[in-house]
């Protein structure tokens, strides 16, 4: 019985480490977004209840000079982009111009809280 459990456990753990896919969400300036995420009252124990994620995403929309980016999915989870993803995102922002809300489709691989980006495109 344990012989069957070990390969199954290994496959389950390995699949949780990284997986490829396509995701829709918002592109944000990483420094701004992380600053907003950490801008909480130290005595507040309900930091996720008091958040206005939509405002944070709009406030931290990427600028033409942004160099580091994060992707925020529909559930409000944020993922840092890898260096190649940052390069692709900066190029996209320069081509598209400034927007109040920068919706994108990202193709790549999630590894923890980081996205290894294969492609990124603006979406409506």
Give short role names for the model-derived ranges.
Residues 1-9:
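Bacterial N-terminal signal peptides that target proteins for export
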Residues 21-124:
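OB-fold and OB-like single-stranded nucleic-acid-recognition modules
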Residues 10-14:
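Gram-negative bacterial Sec-dependent N-terminal signal peptides
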